[in-house]
């Protein structure tokens, strides 16, 4: 009887596979080689502890869905259970139990514990580079503000170091366009040709864009383009040292105006640099990433890593379909 049941379930899985489709997930599953990712994830589980109760690649794929669509842990669990195309993508059969939210929480903790909160994007990008989508001809740099998951602590609480009922010790204040912000800032470098994210860092909102320039620009590109916030003698020297063409928009010296030719150059560079805004627009509109979901830098750094991977995988499926 048990054998018959398993056979029936196998037939049902095959039937589902043949009729349930999600173009994005189908294309992604075919385009990306999951083996090196699975190997990296498996290394988090020592052989002495035995086989993990849930395959880590299943949890990784669930995390991708979660961050791609801006879902909470319970929402992700519910939708994977409900949507057959999502089950198929993550690698669960019709009869398989869906990992619960606690399992997702433990998985993220394990990723952070093994330092993968700053390494997963590089792992994905190796494949994008091998496929010829990251060309390194030109890198665009910019930053965007992210609201904290909690409100800013009251002044009295801050003075006492009490953030239990509000605030995040790693978030900070800044003002942009005369509007106060409390939270974080994502610093991003994008390969111009296909607008793929090459590097990201996360800081408190108060950190100036220019301070993360050398942490996100790799020095292997031919040109770097960034807005006036990055204009400084230090960065000019960095470009010379690394033999990278300097496309940082120029600022006028105090009491002087930019020449007409420099204004035209700035306008041209600005039109190219604006491509990076597409990343921020997708994050905030589609991935619901106007604010961070967690408390503390390391948890939110992992979230930024996943959001960046999701953007690149979205772009990968589009690029693969047109080449």
Descriptions of predicted regions:
Residues 244-260:
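RNase H-like polynucleotidyl transferase catalytic core
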Residues 33, 50-57, 96-99, 268, ...:
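Secondary-structure capping and boundary motifs in well-ordered enzyme cores
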Residues 1-34, 319-323:
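Charged, often Cys/His-bearing segments associated with DNA-binding zinc-finger transcription factors
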Residues 39-40, 52, 71-80, 323:
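Short N-terminal amphipathic alpha-helices
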Residues 237, 242-243, 262-323:
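Basic, amphipathic alpha-helical segments enriched in Lys/Arg and hydrophobic/aromatic residues
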Residues 74, 78-81, 90-95, 99-242, ...:
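Polybasic low-complexity intrinsically disordered regions
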Residues 25-64, 68-69, 259:
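Basic, short loop/linker segments at the boundary and entry of helix-turn-helix/winged-helix-like folds
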